[in-house]
Amino acid sequence: MFQLPILNFSPQQVAGVCETLEESGDVERLGRFLWSLPVAPAACEALNKNESVLRARAIVAFHGGNYRELYHILENHKFTKESHAKLQALWLEAHYQEAEKLRGRPLGPVDKYRVRKKFPLPRTIWDGEQKTHCFKERTRHLLREWYLQDPYPNPSKKRELAQATGLTPTQVGNWFKNRRQRDRAAAAKNRLQQQVLSQGSGRALRAEGDGTPEVLGVATSPAASLSSKAATSAISITSSDSECDI
């Protein structure tokens, strides 16, 4: 395997390469680059203090499923606020995945809330402000725009959107998945209510044709009662657009 002459690189140059590979989303290449770094004590000491290198190591550890290493990096190094959002996402997602593996099923909102309470963000990647777990309006606007163009973005588009919103590709993918599920549920509910309205209208027409008067306040069947309620109220079907993860 070809290796770059890392020994001639300064810590700043190494950090620059890490940042470039991180932005490209090529985690595999980033991992190979990190493995090729020197092991000399002097060089390691300098690199271990560089935030870009530490952030790159955390990303590689997460994608490799090495969550113990990820937690060690995040808990033992103080990161600047610019890195907080991405590293917080890695911390939470890693704990979610461990909990899912342990329970043998996907986590629901309540499960995720309990995981967050059990494993709070370390102060090394958190400034103490309470996180709402809701996407900002600008982020939601961008996600909705992209969703209307393509509800099934490929990995490249997910990375592009992640960079534009400050989220991780995993968060972007989860948002699109949840939005598709909400839209399908709303469409199914809409079809059901339209069927109820249609059945209610048909019965009313038949009753009028037969000359049978309707008795106010008396429903001949549960279905008739349901259709009556549906016919006398305006129906508005909208898919939930909440991005809260509670």
Swiss-Prot record:
Biased composition (Low complexity): 219-246
Covalent S-S links between cysteines: none
Tissue expression from the record: Expressed in the developing and adult retina. Also expressed in the hypothalamic and the pituitary regions.
Keywords assigned by UniProt, alphabetized: Cataract, Developmental protein, Disease variant, DNA-binding, Homeobox, Microphthalmia, Nucleus, Phosphoprotein
Signal peptide stretch: none
Principal subcellular localization: nucleus
Feature: DNA-binding region: 128-187
Phosphothreonine modification, residue list: 212
Residue ranges of the region described as Disordered: 190-246
Family: Belongs to the SIX/Sine oculis homeobox family.
Function statement: May be involved in eye development.
Protein name: Homeobox protein SIX6
Originating organism: Homo sapiens
